[in-house]
């Protein structure tokens, strides 16, 4: 999943850059959305991992 989130962020960065260079605001905004979505998913995934680590410590 982490790779997918990084890919989504990179894809968003490319879209945003191309949209900016070509003055295509729709593509630029789509890129911003992809980047934000990828970052949010990555944050949630990291939070889940940390929560599971804490839970595992209490199980021992």
Curated annotation (Swiss-Prot):
Higher taxonomy: Bacteria, Bacillati, Bacillota, Bacilli, Bacillales
Family as reported in the entry's similarity comment: Belongs to the UPF0337 (CsbD) family.
Protein's UniProt name: UPF0337 protein SSP1134
Location of the region described as Disordered in the Swiss-Prot/TrEMBL record: 1-41
Disulfide links within the chain: none
InterPro entries reported for this sequence: CsbD, UPF0337_stress_rsp, YjbJ_sf
Residue ranges, compositional bias (Basic and acidic residues): 23-41
Species whose genome carries this gene: Staphylococcus saprophyticus subsp. saprophyticus (strain ATCC 15305 / DSM 20229 / NCIMB 8711 / NCTC 7292 / S-41)
Pfam families assigned: CsbD
């Amino acid at each position: 999943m982490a790779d997918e989130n990084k890919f989504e962020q990179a894809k968003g960065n490319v879209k945003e850059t191309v949209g900016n260079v070509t003055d295509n605001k729709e593509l630029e905004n789509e890129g911003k959305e992809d980047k934000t979505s990828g970052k949010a998913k990555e944050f949630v995934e990291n939070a889940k991992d940390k929560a599971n680590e804490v839970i595992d410590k209490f199980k021992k």
